[in-house]
From Swiss-Prot:
EC number of the protein: 5.4.2.8
Domain of life where this protein originates: Eukaryota
Functional description taken from the UniProt entry: Catalyzes the interconversion of mannose-6-phosphate to mannose-1-phosphate, the precursor for the synthesis of GDP-mannose. GDP-mannose is an essential sugar nucleotide for the synthesis of D-mannose-containing cell wall polysaccharides (galactomannans and glucomannans), glycolipids, glycoproteins and the antioxidant L-ascorbate. Can complement the yeast temperature-sensitive mutant sec53-6.
Protein name (Swiss-Prot/TrEMBL): Phosphomannomutase
Pathway: Nucleotide-sugar biosynthesis; GDP-alpha-D-mannose biosynthesis; alpha-D-mannose 1-phosphate from D-fructose 6-phosphate: step 2/2
The organism of origin for this protein: Solanum lycopersicum
Enzyme class: isomerase
InterPro entries per record: HAD-like_sf, HAD-SF_hydro_IIB, HAD_sf, PMM, PMM_cap
One term under GO cellular component: cytosol
Cofactor: Mg(2+)
Amino acid sequence: MAARKAGLIALFDVDGTLTAPRKESTPQMLKFMQELRKVVTVGVVGGSDLVKISEQLGNTVTNDYDYVFSENGLVAHKDGKLIGKQSLKSHLGDEKLKEFINFTLHYIADLDIPIKRGTFIEFRSGMLNVSPIGRNCSQEERDEFEKYDKVQKIRETMVSVLREKFAHFNLTFSIGGQISFDVFPQGWDKTYCLRYLEEFNEIHFFGDKTYKGGNDHEIYESERTVGHTVTSPEETLKQCSVLFLGKDNGSS
């Protein structure tokens, strides 16, 4: 096997790119990523916290990849070691956080949707995750809400209201996954992780939500990256096989 190509990194979104949404990575994908690491530096960047990313990619995720950026890179690991951490609480302050959370909970309380469960707002190190149905819902309920949301645009409408109400907070709202959206200060999207990748002059990013409003859009459009849109983990395998391993096809 040839030596790694210097100055090049393959950077991957998690949900919809390396795994099905909120599902565990397949053995095939885990094996492929280790093969890929032999020829290029490999990193992952997800909106979820490290616990959730570990559930999907394995408990040894920070050692299985060269870079692991959880919460869009607001929590950053390199070679298994923590190299950076940003705090939403320190940035916004408790008063603004309370104002935003109170309004959002009132909005959800008044929201008429078929079902609601629990954990409507999840407080993470560098962002808030807001779910109209509640993160405690089952996988079947997730799938049903996703279909309902595509028609009724529950998340899109809610984001529009919050964006207008809290314009003075300078927040970014990013819809991702099946049931929720992330809220964080402007500039704290996935492009945040690029500050840790100054040594790379060729950054290939792979993601599924690369459209405007999707949580992969900003990094996909960044002038520092070569963006690749995928629709499934299977397509990720195929594109990477052609790009980096010189194969005509990936998974069969």
